[in-house]
Amino acid sequence: MSNTLPHPSGSWRNRYLLMRHGHSLANQQGLIISHPDNGLTGYGLSPLGESQLEQLVAAWSWPTPTRVVHSDFLRTTETAARVARHFGLDTEVDVRLRERCFGALERQADSHYPAVWALDAQDPTHGEYGVESVASVAERLQAVIAELEETYLDATILLVSHGDPLQILLTALAGQPLSAHRDRPALTPASITPLG
């Protein structure tokens, strides 16, 4: 699945493929897994996620990546490894691509997400339930892009991250209010959004 983003003002030095990890065991179980204690070594790809990636690389229709950078959570690491292996690339970890931390909602049902998103729409700096604010997520993901822009030229960089962080990044890059990040169409597992 592919998504599109209006080209922001200015020109990019590189092309980016923003990828949400494949369907995970956390998705399968309907759980919020956002803390490194749980996400680094557990809740990797589900059988559906493995199948999604197999189909994705077999029918790849985006520019061929030259670098693969990913969150260090197991589900993103496995996703990145599968794509990188297909193209004969190594992977690179950047912890700034990690899942948004959902605080006290960790290991709770994912039916709690809408309550957080409703608060996000009122105040992108809120930290209710101990969640990481939308503003903080936007800052760290934009810093990844800024650093890559300074470091590389004419690269095609696959960034493998998580649903909320990528939604927030896309909202920020489009110049929209961060409070509107859930107004964007939801990024589905194993989807890719080209940028630049």
Q: Predicted segments — roles?
A:
Residues 39, 44, 85-142:
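Phosphate-handling substructures
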Residues 24, 165-166:
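Short active-site segment of divalent metal-dependent hydrolases/proteases
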Residues 61-64, 148-155:
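Glycine-rich phosphate-binding loop signature in dinucleotide/nucleotide-binding domains
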Residues 2-15, 19, 23-87:
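Active-site-proximal alpha-helix that buttresses catalytic centers in soluble enzyme cores
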Residues 28-32, 103-107, 171-172:
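Short aromatic-enriched loop/helix-cap "lid" or pocket-rim segments at secondary-structure transitions
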Residues 70-71, 139, 160-161:
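Short beta-strand scaffold positions
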